[in-house]
Swiss-Prot record:
Organism encoding this protein: Methanothermobacter thermautotrophicus (strain ATCC 29096 / DSM 1053 / JCM 10044 / NBRC 100330 / Delta H)
Residues passing through the membrane, by range: 18-38, 39-59, 76-96, 99-119, 138-158, 163-183, 209-229, 230-250
Name of the encoding gene: mtrC
Keyword annotations: Cell membrane, Membrane, Methanogenesis, Methyltransferase, One-carbon metabolism, Transferase, Translocase, Transmembrane, Transmembrane helix
A single GO molecular function term of this UniProt record: tetrahydromethanopterin S-methyltransferase activity
Subunit details: The complex is composed of 8 subunits; MtrA, MtrB, MtrC, MtrD, MtrE, MtrF, MtrG and MtrH.
Pathway in which the depicted protein is active: One-carbon metabolism; methanogenesis from CO(2); methyl-coenzyme M from 5,10-methylene-5,6,7,8-tetrahydromethanopterin: step 2/2
Record family assignment: Belongs to the MtrC family.
EC number: 7.2.1.4
Protein name per the record: Tetrahydromethanopterin S-methyltransferase subunit C
Amino acid sequence: MSVAAGGPAGAAIPESRLMALGIIGGLGGIYASTVNPVIGPVFASLGAVCAIIWGADAIRRVASYGLGTGVPSIGYMSVSIGIVGVVAGLASVFTLPALAAPVVGLILAMILGVVVAVLGKKIVKMKIPILEKCTAEISGAAALSVLGFSAAIAGSYTMQAVLTSVIATGFIGLLFILNTMAIQHPFNACLGPNENQTRTLKLAASTGFISMAIAGLLGIGLNPGWWLVSLVGALCWVVAFKSFVSASFEEAASVKWSGLWPKEEEQ
């Protein structure tokens, strides 16, 4: 059971597949951001959603070793690490080809995630066996999701474009909050004895797509494809959220929309 401090419940989708989805989908979307001024930002945003789903699953695995109180903490910490990795990766253009920037950002974020996790185990004495692996994954997912949405806003993943359209405008602060909530909220909302991976990841898709819709609005005046990003994000959010609600109804013992639950003797 996921809140029994003994690790996550069974997984319908192997973590290796979700990692592949996050890394391949995330990087693919980022690199495709420049193929077309209108379609490119949509690809970048979809890549960010792939990374968010990967990160949400990693949160699910690592946070299942406690009562769930550390879900927001590791979420904010890991997205901070991811942003540091992204900025450092973008800055690598001074020594490496611009094409390498997203990969460098991902690698740096994951390395920093491992370092922070090791410090957490050695100094804070956190007894979570998969802390290093999951912190690295969440940090990497955060890096790709932030860079994906940044590319969607700026229309490109290059340092100059992101610096001008995302960092200088202050949108990077909003992306920090937005991506943290998108990654950590699914398990935070679904945790409990009956939590399961499928329902949690349906909510992760929902939070990812609503974040995509918001990222599209941030691109108003910055790229011509902002409206399509918001439209696709909003439509996909409706589908994902309806799927999550349906799954919740199917697995609930009963549903009550308002008022107090009846006492046992009144049933």
